[in-house]
Each structure stands twice: as structure tokens, then as C-alpha cells.
């Protein structure tokens, strides 16, 4: 099932008991965060605050607060089915020619999907039903959340930032937090390696001193939103990828102030520019680490046009110590990463980003080990293969007999199969998340790999231990007589 806009997804969630309307007045200043946090930790529904204090625009929160809802947004019923999305991405990243007639027939569905890639331009889009320009633009009238007591100002969190570089044909969609600075100004916090920042850098080099056009969409359809946080190939637009997932072309329209295309069914559109000379100090804000981050200087986004649907809905979230909404997104998108990694490294059995690790800072990988040093090769490959793992600080590699998603198994493997000196890899001066205050220098720190696999000849001179396993016939006999033993609640082994 696909959703043309955010509202149709809201209706679907409500029909399936996955959304709760809240009519009681709730303040966007701190109260919404506390309510959403409690509901998310209880694995509760998405929330539609219909009466935010001081505003008549409803606020949608906790939309992707469970992996199930992430899957539902992509037309799947179970997060494990998101591996289909990963298979598609793996194919797009490295398409292989058919090996024969049968293989060509088998690949037809993927080629059919590719026909849905180009976005479709529409006229009179819903996102431009109401148009405000000049003095009419007032961002303070939006119900922007002030998430934590120590936050410096309200923060736009789910803005889909649309940019285009002078060297690319495709547009880039990215999600970057934006601090409210004034009636028509936001601080665009994009890190240097992100698509929007790279587009801006290229533009400044080619057009020094000129204003850079930027558009931010709030409340786009769920597939387009998730396309912006998925490892789409660099040469492909997120609009094209959203069309592939949806099974029909993404509807876009031309922005009023520039040539950028925006999601036509979005709830709110902010259009404007970044002056390369205008910067501002951003933060501090509570973030996904569970701490307040340092302040730093980022470009200022000046909003010249604000358009929106009639009776628009403001889409928002908060970030904090896991679990939070980004952590739940990480759990769901974990299934997308597995086929992509397997395509490059077929020896990988499973891959896990534990949500406690702030979504991406730790990874556990199980492999079918084939030679001495294999675990170290996989570590290096994972760090290098996808941009999403550039900031992963810790990688643990285990054998296929270890469930990499079970901490009991992983800790057992670490403590019995590792020698700290021999099996630990330390790499200095690597890219690290700017928000990681534990690193000695902002944006630059070390990485640690742990080889918790069984060691082969050449990796150790000692006889390696043999795992204890009960005789299968004995286990079956005990199963047969268990009810006669009078022992209750026995685990099934």
C-alpha cells in the first residue's frame, strides 16, 4: 500500500490503531517532548496534538516511533520485509547484467520499478494553497517544539531540505535540524559531509558571493521523508528512489522563488536562500546522544516565501537518549542495510546497529569466517563502504554461531574469543560525528574494531577451545519425559 500524502498515512495509522488524537491543550514548549517520550518508550502510537497551546495548527509527533510504523510507511507490514528495499538498493548500486533468459525474466520487476523513477510535475499543488511572502512570513507562528529545558530556542526537526549543486543534475534531499532565529530566519545545521553542505560548497566555489537557493518541506509524504534517510546511490535523486518504493512517480511542483522542485503534497514549504556571508552560533541542544551538544557556527537560512495546505499539519519530533525516534528509524533501516552489505561482502550473515548505541555508533556483524584476518577485512569494509557508517566508532565481528542481535551471545564471544591486544584494532584520526564530545577534536577521533571470532591457525599458536554441546539424542529423550518430571516452566532449548 502506498500513500500519496502525509494525511492518507495518518488516516491509515488511525484505522489500524497506530495513531492517537489528543484534544487536550498541550504546550510545544517541553510538554510535547515529555508526552511523546513516554509514549515512545511504551511502544505506543503516533500522536496528533490537535490543540497545541498558543497555536491552531495541529502537531504530528512520534510518527516513526516504532519499527512497525516505519515499515508501514514503506508499504510493508513487518520491519523484516524492509530487506526488500535493501535488495533494490543493492541492485541499483551495482546492477548486474542478466546471466541468461531466465535471469532476465526474473529481473523484469526491478526494471519495471525503474520506470517509476522520474518525478511528475503537477500544477496547482496542495502545498501552495496558501501563499505568504515578505512581511507575511512569520515562523514564530508555527508550533515549533522547544524540546528540552537547556535548548537555546525552538527547533525545526523534520524539515526536508532540498538543494542542488551546480555540477549535479539531481536534487538532494536531507534532514538537518534548524534553530529558530527570527520571524524569517533559521540556522541550517548541516555537517560538511552531508549532501546539502556539499552542494552549498560547490555553489560557493562556482558563484562566489551569490545567494544560494534552498527550500525546506515539512510534512511530505512518508516515502519521500524516509527516502531522505536511506542510503540512496549518490547519482540518484531521493525523489526517484521514492517513486521506486511507491510504485508510482513522486509528484513535485516548482518552488515559487527558484527552480527547485518540492514535494507537491507537503503540508508546509519554506523557500528562501543562504547568504554565504551570514553565519550564526547554533545550539546548545539536547540530541540523540542524551547530552546537550557544543555550539558552533552554521549558515543562516532566510525564508522569503512560506506556502502551506489549508488546515496544515506541523510534523515534529525530538531527539534524546535512546530510545528516541531516530533510534527506532535506525532499528527499521537496519534491515535495509543487510542486503546492501551482503551484496559487497557475501560472507556477512547478519548486521546489527543496537539502538542503545545512538543508532550508528556501534555495529555488530556476524560472518562466515573463511581465513585468518577475515574479521579485520570486514571491519575495514563496513567503515568504508557506506557513508552512513563513517561515524560508527565500534565494530564487533562474531562467527555465524553467535546471534549478533543478542547481547548475551555477543558478550560471551567477546570474553571467550578475544585477546584484547591481538584482537583489537585501533585507528586514529578518522571522521567522527561532530556531536560526539568524547572525541579529542570536534569531528575527528578514533575507531575500535573487536575481532570476537574463533581464531584460526596463524592467528594463534594454541589449541582452540571446542564449544560444549549436549548430545542431540539426550535432548530429545529429556523433551519426551519432561512433563513427567514435575518441573514447571522449563525453557525450550
Swiss-Prot record:
<protein>
    <recommendedName>
        <fullName>3-octaprenyl-4-hydroxybenzoate carboxy-lyase</fullName>
        <ecNumber>4.1.1.98</ecNumber>
    </recommendedName>
</protein>
<dbReference type="InterPro" id="IPR049381">
    <property type="entry name" value="UbiD-like_C"/>
</dbReference>
<dbReference type="InterPro" id="IPR023677">
    <property type="entry name" value="UbiD_bacteria"/>
</dbReference>
<dbReference type="Pfam" id="PF20695">
    <property type="entry name" value="UbiD_N"/>
</dbReference>
<dbReference type="GO" id="GO:0005886">
    <property type="term" value="C:plasma membrane"/>
</dbReference>
<comment type="pathway">
    <text>Cofactor biosynthesis; ubiquinone biosynthesis.</text>
</comment>
<keyword id="KW-1003">Cell membrane</keyword>
<feature type="binding site">
    <location>
        <position position="172"/>
    </location>
    <ligand>
        <name>Mn(2+)</name>
    </ligand>
</feature>
<dbReference type="Pfam" id="PF20696">
    <property type="entry name" value="UbiD_C"/>
</dbReference>
<keyword id="KW-0210">Decarboxylase</keyword>
<dbReference type="GO" id="GO:0005829">
    <property type="term" value="C:cytosol"/>
</dbReference>
<dbReference type="InterPro" id="IPR002830">
    <property type="entry name" value="UbiD"/>
</dbReference>
<dbReference type="InterPro" id="IPR049383">
    <property type="entry name" value="UbiD-like_N"/>
</dbReference>
<keyword id="KW-0472">Membrane</keyword>
<keyword id="KW-0456">Lyase</keyword>
<keyword id="KW-0479">Metal-binding</keyword>
<dbReference type="GO" id="GO:0006744">
    <property type="term" value="P:ubiquinone biosynthetic process"/>
</dbReference>
<dbReference type="GO" id="GO:0046872">
    <property type="term" value="F:metal ion binding"/>
</dbReference>
<feature type="binding site">
    <location>
        <position position="238"/>
    </location>
    <ligand>
        <name>Mn(2+)</name>
    </ligand>
</feature>
<dbReference type="InterPro" id="IPR048304">
    <property type="entry name" value="UbiD_Rift_dom"/>
</dbReference>
<dbReference type="Pfam" id="PF01977">
    <property type="entry name" value="UbiD"/>
</dbReference>
<comment type="subunit">
    <text>Homohexamer.</text>
</comment>
<keyword id="KW-0288">FMN</keyword>
<feature type="active site" description="Proton donor">
    <location>
        <position position="287"/>
    </location>
</feature>
<feature type="binding site">
    <location>
        <begin position="175"/>
        <end position="177"/>
    </location>
    <ligand>
        <name>prenylated FMN</name>
    </ligand>
</feature>
<comment type="function">
    <text>Catalyzes the decarboxylation of 3-octaprenyl-4-hydroxy benzoate to 2-octaprenylphenol, an intermediate step in ubiquinone biosynthesis.</text>
</comment>
<keyword id="KW-0285">Flavoprotein</keyword>
<feature type="binding site">
    <location>
        <begin position="189"/>
        <end position="191"/>
    </location>
    <ligand>
        <name>prenylated FMN</name>
    </ligand>
</feature>
<dbReference type="GO" id="GO:0008694">
    <property type="term" value="F:3-octaprenyl-4-hydroxybenzoate carboxy-lyase activity"/>
</dbReference>
<comment type="similarity">
    <text>Belongs to the UbiD family.</text>
</comment>
<keyword id="KW-0464">Manganese</keyword>
<feature type="binding site">
    <location>
        <begin position="194"/>
        <end position="195"/>
    </location>
    <ligand>
        <name>prenylated FMN</name>
    </ligand>
</feature>
<keyword id="KW-0831">Ubiquinone biosynthesis</keyword>
Amino acid at each position: 500500500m502506498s500513500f500519496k500524502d502525509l494525511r492518507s498515512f495518518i488516516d491509515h495509522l488511525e484505522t489500524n490503531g497506530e495513531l492517537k488524537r489528543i484534544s487536550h491543550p498541550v504546550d510545544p514548549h517541553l510538554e510535547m517532548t515529555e508526552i511523546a517520550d513516554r509514549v515512545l518508550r511504551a511502544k505506543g502510537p503516533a500522536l496528533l496534538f490537535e490543540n497545541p497551546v498558543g497555536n491552531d495548527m495541529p502537531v504530528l509527533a512520534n510518527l516513526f516511533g516504532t519499527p512497525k510504523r516505519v515499515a508501514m510507511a514503506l508499504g510493508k507490514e513487518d520491519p523484516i520485509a524492509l530487506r526488500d528495499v535493501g535488495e533494490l538498493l543493492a541492485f541499483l548500486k551495482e546492477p548486474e547484467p542478466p546471466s541468461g533468459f531466465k535471469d532476465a525474466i526474473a529481473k523484469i520487476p526491478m526494471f519495471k520499478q525503474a520506470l517509476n523513477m522520474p518525478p511528475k510535475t503537477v500544477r496547482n499543488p496542495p502545498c501552495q494553497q496558501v501563499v505568504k511572502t515578505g512581511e507575511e512570513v512569520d515562523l514564530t507562528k508555527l508550533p515549533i517544539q522547544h524540546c528540552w529545558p537547556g535548548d537555546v530556542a525552538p527547533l525545526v526537526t523534520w524539515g526536508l531540505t532540498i538543494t542542488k549543486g551546480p555540477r549535479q543534475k539531481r536534487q538532494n534531499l536531507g534532514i538537518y535540524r534548524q534553530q529558530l532565529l527570527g520571524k524569517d530566519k533559521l540556522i541550517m545545521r548541516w555537517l560538511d559531509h552531508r549532501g546539502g553542505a556539499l552542494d552549498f560548497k560547490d555553489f560557493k566555489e562556482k558563484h562566489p558571493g551569490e545567494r544560494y537557493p534552498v527550500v525546506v518541506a515539512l510534512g511530505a509524504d512518508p516515502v519521500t521523508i524516509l527516502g531522505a534517510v536511506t542510503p540512496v546511490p549518490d547519482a540518484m535523486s531521493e525523489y526517484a528512489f521514492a517513486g521506486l518504493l511507491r510504485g508510482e512517480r513522486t509528484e513535485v511542483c516548482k518552488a515559487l522563488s527558484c527552480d527547485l522542485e518540492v514535494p507537491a503534497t507537503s503540508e508546509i514549504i519554506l523557500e528562501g536562500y543562504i547568504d554565504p556571508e551570514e553565519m550564526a552560533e547554533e545550539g546548545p541542544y539536547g540530541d540523540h546522544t542524551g547530552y546537550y551538544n557544543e555550539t558552533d557556527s552554521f549558515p543562516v537560512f532566510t525564508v522569503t516565501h512560506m506556502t502551506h495546505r489549508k488546515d496544515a499539519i506541523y510534523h515534529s519530533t525530538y531527539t534524546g537518549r535512546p530510545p528516541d525516534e531516530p533510534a527506532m528509524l535506525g532499528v527499521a533501516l537496519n534491515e535495509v542495510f543487510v542486503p546492501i552489505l551482503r551484496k559487497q561482502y557475501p560472507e556477512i550473515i547478519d548486521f546489527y546497529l543496537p539502538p542503545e548505541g545512538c543508532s550508528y555508533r556501534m555495529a555488530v556483524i556476524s560472518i562466515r569466517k573463511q581465513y585468518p584476518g577475515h574479521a579485520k577485512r570486514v571491519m575495514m569494509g563496513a567503515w568504508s563502504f557506506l557513508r552512513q557508517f563513517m561515524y560508527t566508532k565500534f565494530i564487533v565481528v562474531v562467527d555465524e554461531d553467535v546471534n549478533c542481535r543478542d547481547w548475551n551471545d555477543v558478550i560471551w564471544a567477546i570474553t571467550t574469543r578475544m585477546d584484547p591486544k591481538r584482537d583489537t584494532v585501533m585507528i586514529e584520526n578518522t571522521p567522527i560525528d561532530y556531536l560526539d564530545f568524547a572525541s579529542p577534536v570536534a569531528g575527528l577521533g578514533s575507531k575500535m574494531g573487536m575481532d570476537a571470532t574463533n581464531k584460526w591457525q596463524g592467528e594463534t599458536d594454541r589449541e582452540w577451545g571446542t564449544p560444549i554441546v549436549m548430545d542431540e539424542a539426550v535432548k530429545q529423550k529429556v523433551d519426551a519425559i519432561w512433563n513427567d518430571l514435575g518441573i514447571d516452566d522449563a525453557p525450550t532449548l
